[in-house]
């Protein structure tokens, strides 16, 4: 037997909620029970309908009934919906009253799973200078705390998205503070805020943010979350951005190549294709006295592979000359075989494939065919053997084009 569908609820022409469970009558008849109705599913729906289709007096009556308990209602699993509906249909005076009421409890509301949605809705509805200025003043002392919270960070993001520069600058002042930029960028949720801030920034805000990320890049590239911020900046269409990072990181690329997260950034800089940046890294690799260590390192070997792919012919010959003496170390490792596959490069007419004086075997089927066939099982094509999250032996995905890191919440 097919189940019988429950009767649909409806609203009468007078604004009365009509249904088998509730028949509340006209709004004035239940004016003293608004808070009670906010706590029930049917009552909450009734009030939302009243606010949506009722008169301005109806909206004002509901608002006055809930304003004193607004923080608690915004955090309620049911009542937050009537709060959001009120924010959509209220005017400036009610918005200012709501902001004033929230002032003492804004952190608790922003960090609550229901409260954050209601607060974001309130921010969405603020359009006047007085409203945005009031919200700025309430949130200003708490930005650093909120950007590190799984729910609160979305409130900060909404301010950056919705408010013009004059009223969202206070967020950028915190994000670019020299004492805070590393702490925020190296936080699970803070790194997301930094990336979204770059998306929503005006030109002046973006310029300062990029400068701060470059300035603090050495600790950031070594961090599990901070490296994503650096990679995000590297993906931005900014002329010479890779070269700016190399000026800060110069002399440290061998150290960074051997670390889990920073090695991703080193490859990202090399793949950016800026000659000065690439030359700076290749010079350090070629000058390294411990090539055998790099070749066998679980992270640096990928940097060496990228170096072989991105180097010009002269640099490639120098790298080959340094690697050939260590071929015996490479034959029994997966990444060693990948390095060997990149040793051979089709020479340009009139040039040699290897550095003068070096000897290497003729390209084996593995070496010669690797560039023209599918990669070994578990490997990946492209300039970085670990450029995608799948099968990455380092467990640290490289941020691809404009990818935003979204940690699990």
Could you tell me what each predicted segment is?
Residues 1-409:
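Eukaryotic gene-expression regulator signature that favors modular helical reader/repeat domains
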